[in-house]
Amino acid sequence: MKKSSKEISSSQSLKNGGSDHFFNTSLMYVLAACLASFIFGYQVSVLNTIKNFIVIEFGWCTGNKVECDDSTLKSSFLLASVFIGAVVGSGFSGYLVQHGRRFSLLVIYNFFILVSILTSITHHFHTILFSRLLSGFGIGLITVSVPMYISEMTHKDKKGAYGVLHQLFITFGIFVAVLLGMAMGEAPDAKSVDALGEFQKIWWRLMFFFPCLISILGIVLLTFFYKEETPYYLFENGKIEESKKILKKIYGTDNVDEPLKAIKDAVEQNEAAKKNSISLMRAMQIPSYRNVILLGCILSGLQQFTGINVLVSNSNELYKEFLSNKLITTLSVIMTVVNFLMTFPAIYIVEKLGRKTLLLCGCAGVICAFLPTAIANQIDSTSAFVKNLSIAATFVMIISFAVSYGPVLWIYLHEMFPSEIKDSAASLASLVNWVCAIIVVFPSDIIIKKSPTILFFIFSGMSILSFLFIFFFIKETKGGEIGTSPYITMEERQKHMGKSAV
């Protein structure tokens, strides 16, 4: 019996590890990029378990109150410096990705080799602060480069699932950073004057060096195995046959006319936008474009006010208010394991439930976690029940974030903007995200020492605001074509881009 063309196409797709399966050629490219996501998570969390060891080795706090207050301020700067650097990096990322998505990843990996070496040999506050600022700069580049690479290197039906891998590897990096920190032993008090052991003096430096090894692996993969640029970038630069070739790998079939046409349409729209000078500044003067940019920036900024980066970068300090030193790092490790594992469900439900529904569920989870906890702490923060409730609340929050706001935001930011402003608008939204991270993380050390209840009230209140904002203003993007936006009609875009955008 003669097979139909559909059957032949299907069998060929299976033979090539096509798009019907989660594990296929496209996934290999995505994983090579997600090593940068791992570095992102690792760098954000690495100070969580070793910060106090650094304070002791550098002798920032030896018992004098003024000296120790100054030490707390230094610790706050070290925590926030990554996010300050990320603001600059995310602002620069839009320029970098214009030279190639794969190229930007190679720049990032080479950059982190240098940064890892610099951080591991530091001996002074100013040098470690500078190296942490550089780490943040690299992270800022990652926030735009990796999601864009994944979005353009992925089958249309897998964009959501593969997009979640960016967040999954971030959580894995967070987990590994805290796990390696366990080798340092019991979390010390920053005011301790006891000298560190030889192993501890070496180990915290090796922890800073570790991303260098991951970066080398990333360079090897992108240089020798996954050498192609994204099909969108290739087509945009006139390399149509090369674009078609990589699309065949991604889709697992020789028939790639439909995705090629989608890229062609998106590139033509983008070309028309460039001819008509739809810059970010001009877009902000056009109501329809300004609205979608503001929505993306607000959504991105609100993510930080769930409190995620306080838990990721400073959970040890928070848990000190509720636990003995012996259990602090262990609990932080358990928290990062939960964070990592609970990102997996998002891979499967992001395409089933959609982006908006997941965002709403995540905000509701944070509200349910922190609001009762804040009220309970206000009534009696000394009771064992309230302390246990506070610890449980952090886990409920982590679970809620891991399956929703964490992975979905970065997918959404690359689906909500039309192609003519996508690069610059996504970069601006990422920049806003990092500015808000600084606002939240920098005072966290001081606020935790004063009263964790304040943080619980802030995070629950902002999550209520986030829920209302998403419910009333955010639209679904699931299943949308590349380069389109549910917020701006093609007619509206043509009005500003010209008829050539059709």
Curated annotation (Swiss-Prot):
Beta-D-glucose binds at residues 167, 303, 309, 339. Disulfide bonds join 61-68. It catalyses: D-glucose(out) = D-glucose(in); D-fructose(out) = D-fructose(in); D-galactose(in) = D-galactose(out); D-mannose(out) = D-mannose(in). Coiled coil: none annotated. Keywords: Cell membrane, Disulfide bond, Membrane, Sugar transport, Transmembrane, Transmembrane helix, Transport. It is a multi-pass membrane protein. It is found in: Cell membrane. The chain crosses the membrane at residues 27-47, 77-97, 103-123, 133-153, 164-184, 206-226, 292-312, 330-350, 357-377, 391-411, 428-448, 454-474. GO terms for molecular function: hexose transmembrane transporter activity. Residues 48-76, 124-132, 185-205, 313-329, 378-390, 449-453 are extracellular. Belongs to the major facilitator superfamily. Sugar transporter (TC 2.A.1.1) family. Homodimer. This is Hexose transporter 1. The gene is HT1.
